[in-house]
Every structure is written in C-alpha cells, then in structure tokens.
Amino acid sequence: MNILVVGNGGREHAISWKIAQSIFSKKIYVAPGNAGTEIDYKLKNIDISSNDINKLVKFAKEKKIDLTIVGPEEPLSNGISDVFSYYKLPIFGPKKFSAKLESSKIFAKNFLNKYNIPTARHKEFSDQKLAIKYLNRVKFPIVIKVDGLAFGKGVKIIKNIKESEKFILDVLVKKKFGMSGSKILIEDMLHGEEISFTAIINNNGFLPMAISQDHKKSGDKDTGLNTGGMGAYSPVSFVTSSIYNNIIKDILLPTLYGMKKENLIYTGILYIGIMIDYNNNVNVIEFNCRFGDPEAQSILFRMKSDFLLHILSAMYGNLDSQIIELDNRYSLGIVLATKSYPKKYPIGLNILGNFENELKDTKIFHSSTKNINKNLTTNGGRVLCITSLGKSIEDAQKKSKIVANSINWQGKFFRNDIGNREIFYLKKYKNYKF
C-alpha cells in the first residue's frame, strides 16, 4: 500500500515509523515530515504543509495513495477528512463536525452533559464582565479553558480573582488566542491523577490501546507553564482493572452511543483525557481526535502488533476482532525542548550528539527538527522525544535520561521527573496486586 502520513511532529514520526514495519506498507510519504522522517530510508518527506488540503489531495491522486493517516488536530478541524472523502480518497481521521469534540470545548461539554458522561461542572462565557461577575461567586482554585484549539496552552489553573481577571482580559479582550478564545469555559477543578486513554474507533466498535500518563507542565514537580507535553510513560499501574472497567462503562461506551445518536461520523483515534479522583471515580477532562504527543511515542514503541492492520480493520473490517499486542515492559519518553518554551523561543540551533548509537530499546523520535546544510537544527520548541523500553519504570527512565544527556544544543532542557508518579505509586502500594 502507498501511505501518506500528514504532519511534522514526534507523533507523526512515531506513526510513520510504526506503519513502516507493516507487511502491508509499500511506500510511505510524510507531509511535510521532519529531519527524523527525512533520514529514515523507509520514509519520504513531501514538502506540503499539513494544512494545505488542496495540495495534499492533488498529491494523493497523483501518487495513487491507498490510505492517508492524519496526525495533528488542525487539519482535522479544517475538514481534511471531508475533502478526501469527497474525492473518494481513503483517510483515517474523523470528519470536521466530529472533530468538534476537540476543536470546541463547549461543544464537547454539551455532548458530555447530554449523554450523562462524568465531567467537571462548568459555565461558558463570551462576555468579560459576566465571566468576572460569576468568578466572584466561585470557590478557587478553578480552571479556565479557551473554547478552540490552543495546542495545549489554552488551559489555566486559576488561584484567585486577580489572576482570573488578567487571564480573561488576555483571552476575551486582547484576543491572545485569536478566534479560539472568543468563548471560554470556567470549570470546577478536578483533583486526582490524570491519564490518557487512547483507542482506535469507528461507528461500530472500538479497540483500546495502552493507557499512558502525560506530563503537561514545563518544569519538574509540575511547575511552570502548560505545554503540549514534556514526557509520557505507559503502562500506568494505578489504573486497576476496576478503574479500567469504569472508564469503558461510564465514559467510552456512552461516548460511542452519543456519537451514533449525533451522527458524528468517526473512524480514527480517540484520546480521552481522564481524571481519576482519590475515590477512583473517573471524569472526562477533554477529548482529542488524534494521538497525544508524546503519548503516541510511548504507546507505539510498546506495540508489537501490526498498527496498519488495526487501522485497516477500523476502516474496512471488524475492529472488535482485533487484539493489540503490547510489550509488557514500560515505555517512557522524555521530551527535549528549547529554553523559554512554551514562550517565544529561537529556532535554527545546531543539535550536537551521536544519533547513530541509540541504546538498545531506545528510539529518538524527532519532533521539531530540520536539516540545514547537513546540520541537524531545532525547528520548534519541543525538539526530540527520547523513548525507551525497560523492565521497570526506573530502567526505562534511566535509559532515556542517558540519551537525553548525550544530546545538546544551546538552551536545551528536559524534565527529570518523567515517570516519578509511577515510581511513587508502586512504592506506596508495593504489596498491592494491580
């Protein structure tokens, strides 16, 4: 099969790398890709933006692409699946209206409430004065979210009224997030542990993948600003079989039922951010209509079965008959980023390190890299994701840190505590059988 992967991040590097292992894949194109996909002889970068839908359609026709897999959320929210389907070009990813589950947090909240899916209480606002008036009656801390896509940076935990007034001014008046911030959600703050539940779904079934835990704050011990994700690991041992069953029963099944009732046409990845409270209750934080990044790197690095076969089964066959085979070891990814990320950061910095000598069971996934005059350079805030397998979480963490410390550029930083929550829970419940 001729495959086109749309996107240029670490998630898309992991997807194309995994697809290349399938017996069903022949040629794999990545649009636009990055330096990591460029140096992989099984992959070919195409200089087309992931948001240039017309050029992607033209390319898919010319190269007789058998399947297009969409990585990032923006082209999905812009209707890439609708356009490809119109031209009878097979594509893996939900239609534009269905992708509103991610592109509009208000749409998602209304959906959750309508189908009695547990989530935090909330109010929506487009007027600054009404929002601040409401905040004078609430108990802090609370959470404020911009309605539209903000690439992981449109959520803020607010500790007091002064802080909330500033954030609302930035969003609703100063338009810091553009049209994405034309409305906001003010939510009760949920407490507990946040996990990422990922599944391949269609309108007739689902295939759960590995559960993972992301680390969204830029600094150790969850300090600093919200980012797109600074690291992830899988599996997550504190998700017991009882909690897992509650996720399926209380969240996934009613979500799929609601999708059918609302005619949300969907064949793709569904990633649900879930908060598990200290009584083991589950609540939906958010829907994402694609893999998380860096969750994709940790999940796909564990996967032993044929990812492309699972996708094809979702599109053409019986998805419920599929079984995902996973390595029983831990997979842990550490994101290497450029100083000042997620604020303004420089690009074009030379990256130094021996990429040829990856440790056994370690993979360097490229997120924002570019080859300039045969020099590997940074091309964004999150640059690389060092992902390792280990018999223990400590083993996987150690391997990733060794490689992370061997790669350098001006201002490189990473979190040192990715996976520490798992270590904490395993020690706390060392006599408990998960």
Swiss-Prot record:
Keywords in alphabetical order: ATP-binding, Ligase, Magnesium, Manganese, Metal-binding, Nucleotide-binding, Purine biosynthesis
Reactions catalysed, as given in the entry: 5-phospho-beta-D-ribosylamine + glycine + ATP = N(1)-(5-phospho-beta-D-ribosyl)glycinamide + ADP + phosphate + H(+)
Gene Ontology molecular function: any one: phosphoribosylamine-glycine ligase activity
Top-level taxonomic group: Bacteria
Cofactor or coenzyme needed: Mg(2+); Mn(2+)
Record's cofactor remark: Binds 1 Mg(2+) or Mn(2+) ion per subunit.
Binding, ATP: 135-196
E.C. designation(s): 6.3.4.13
Residue numbers binding Mg(2+): 286, 288
Domain ATP-grasp intervals: 109-316
Biological process according to GO: 'de novo' IMP biosynthetic process; purine nucleobase biosynthetic process
SUPFAM superfamilies, alphabetized: Glutathione synthetase ATP-binding domain-like (SSF56059), PreATP-grasp domain (SSF52440), Rudiment single hybrid motif (SSF51246)
Pfam families: GARS_A (PF01071), GARS_C (PF02843), GARS_N (PF02844)
Similarity-based family: Belongs to the GARS family.
PANTHER family in UniProt: PHOSPHORIBOSYLAMINE--GLYCINE LIGASE, PHOSPHORIBOSYLAMINE--GLYCINE LIGASE, CHLOROPLASTIC
NCBIfam families hit by this protein: purD
Protein's name in the database: Phosphoribosylamine--glycine ligase
Organism: Wigglesworthia glossinidia brevipalpis
